[in-house]
Amino acid sequence: MNPPKITDIDEKIGSSCAELIRDGDCLQLGIGAMPDAILGFLTHKKDLGIHTEMFSDGVVDLVEAGVVTCARKNFHPGKMVATFFMGTEKLYKFVHNNPMVQMFPVNITNNPAIIAQNDNMVSINSTLQVALTLSLIHI
């Protein structure tokens, strides 16, 4: 599967959001161009962790750069925790028999009590719409 197309706007937002992520943070990643854009700006960070339902090629690049180590995670330290993967052949080759990758069902990866075991969790997601009037949008 081809990665989502990252636009100039995605890159500007991604650059700003990446400034909010600190060394040692544990990341939950959503689907789409925005999480991938943010990941591209994290190459100067240290000891990031991954505890997420899904991850993509951007995580592989950060592991290979030594940015993602999962060393500061409390739940399965040294391991990336995920339910599924979405990306290119490079991603699937990376996760195949990789001892750093641990697969769990969604009732583990998305369980608030388990997520809370990791310090400094940061969720990176996109949104489709926001109502500025604070009313609900029914789609």
Residues covered by each model-derived region:
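Active-site-adjacent helical/loop segments in soluble small-molecule enzymes
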Residues: 107
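Short loop/turn motifs at secondary-structure junctions and domain boundaries
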Residues: 119-121
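Metallocofactor- and cofactor-centric catalytic cores in central/energy metabolism, strongly enriched
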Residues: 1-104, 114, 129-133
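Conserved small/polar residues in nucleotide/adenosyl-binding loops
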Residues: 137-139
